Amino acid sequence: MSSKHWDYKKDLVLSHLAGLCQSNPHVRLIESERVVISAENQEDKITLISGGGSGHEPLHAGFVTKDGLLDAAVAGFIFASPSTKQIFSAIKAKPSKKGTLIIVKNYTGDILHFGLAAEKAKAEGLNAELLIVQDDVSVGKAKNGLVGRRGLAGTSLVHKILGAKAYLQKDNLELHQLVTFGEKVVANLVTIGASLDHVTIPARANKQEEDDSDDEHGYEVLKHDEFEIGMGIHNEPGIKKSSPIPTVDELVAELLEYLLSTTDKDRNYVQFDKNDEVVLLINNLGGTSVLELYAIQNIVVDQLASKYSIKPVRIFTGTFTTSLDGPGFSITLLNATKTGDKDILKFLDHKTSAPGWNSNISDWSGRVDNFIVAAPEIDEGDSSSKVSVDAKLYADLLESGVKKVISKEPKITLYDTVAGDGDCGETLANGSNAILKALAEGKLDLKDGVKSLVQITDIVETAMGGTSGGLYSIFISALAKSLKEKELSEGAYTLTLETISGSLQAALQSLFKYTRARTGDRTLIDALEPFVKEFAKSKDLKLANKAAHDGAEATRKLEAKFGRASYVAEEEFKQFESEGGLPDPGAIGLAALISGITDAYFKSETKL
């Protein structure tokens, strides 16, 4: 994993807070104390204040709002607890006649500093109480002793639930009642995470020796094939390092065992009974893609149902409590039933403008367990034709062509890793393998020149995707259309090189309606256009094959004008100077297909 971060002239934490307030009209910044507060004073409700070391964004400042979450958040330096002075400033900035609830994660520095601020507030006659969030299950009861569990992503749920309760029930809610309820919420939370590496900390002008972590030891960077379970959000070591990296399905199964096992008495912090309502939170630790995050959620939900008979009544997936750029995720479960408050789901569903609570769903009434629906039926009509072709020759040409493409996949992938996004070889191989499969299963009507091309279009469109898939699909579909039009105007006929050459020209013109790329633009057109033009002129497949090959090779000297290759720096191309330059991967792939078809044609005794 890269250890690089951008460099900042100004204080990173303060710049972050300023940026947050610039983009959110509902909050203000006490710059000298690094405190973000709600722009509205609501002294008729219990105020909620939280905070801690920076690096866990959007927690905590991203949860400050006017409508039912935090009223203030205090930011320390990265992974370092804020000072008591800062915290006390937040308390004074958001006074309340009904009192202030201070929520902290269970780390020694936070408890000491926030606790002292609470005591100072009480000494001045203010009503203030401290609630400590602890939801980690990775460290068992025997080891954590008097320290308790670490505070992790469950803190986000605590903020949301208690913030909404204080807002919605402000007229009838007392501080001691909110504290008692908060303790029940915390007692019914469990969280565990997994990561591919420890996080990297940006350089900063204001370094501090202490941090929020209670870990007295350093950490070792994980090896490239290693992962870790139970890693803390301040780089604290977890409970297990292992190699090789498992599938997410296997990893999720292990993580859920830590959360839900009834036989592991050391970690059985929360009991989940059959009819309990359970809330699930999938949290991005900072470096996990959104694509992966929802896939992880899907796997978690499936395993909760199949192995534990748990169907979460609410699912929240996103970036809530991070560890800078941590390449991992955490799973949090809340037993909503055992908190004893029938309105707890209403608190979770309450709409908020806080940017840190990144779930905009407040109405769950339309939720269904089976969310899969059938695709609409599309009547594509009968593509059958009276355009005949020798089925054996056709099969041989297809098989030889796609096998040649598959053999070139590693080289095409290498080229595209530099010139594009690295998927060209795999995309072409996917389409080729799908055609081989269709041939093996007899799914192509190879006696019908038009119907078979329509079938191949469907296969290519489904298997390939991307730009290549689109170009191939349009061209093959247009080729089928041209062959069909000839039948409609002239009647039944058998494919010959001459009829094919005319339809290839028509197909190329159709393709040109959808792409501005032409020969010389360093795309697959550099192989396709010369092939079609030479074939139309000479009706000689060998000459046309050579034209395609020469066109593809010529791209080694061309400047890219289309696609991702057009953005690549010139120095990236230098590693291929020994072979004449870096060619366009798509052109090389198409030339391989044409070459394979040509080889098979001249080996066959049957000719068109």
UniProtKB/Swiss-Prot annotation:
ATP binds at residues 421-424, 467-468, 523-524, 584-586. Its main location: cytoplasm. The keyword Metal-binding does not apply. Keywords: ATP-binding, Cytoplasm, Glycerol metabolism, Kinase, Nucleotide-binding, Transferase. Residues 392-599 form the DhaL domain. It catalyses: dihydroxyacetone + ATP = dihydroxyacetone phosphate + ADP + H(+); D-glyceraldehyde + ATP = D-glyceraldehyde 3-phosphate + ADP + H(+). GO terms for cellular component: cytosol. The keyword ATP-binding applies. Its EC number is 2.7.1.28, 2.7.1.29. Pathway: Polyol metabolism; glycerol fermentation; glycerone phosphate from glycerol (oxidative route): step 2/2. Catalyzes both the phosphorylation of dihydroxyacetone and of glyceraldehyde. Belongs to the dihydroxyacetone kinase (DAK) family. NCBIfam families: dak_ATP (TIGR02361). This is Dihydroxyacetone kinase.
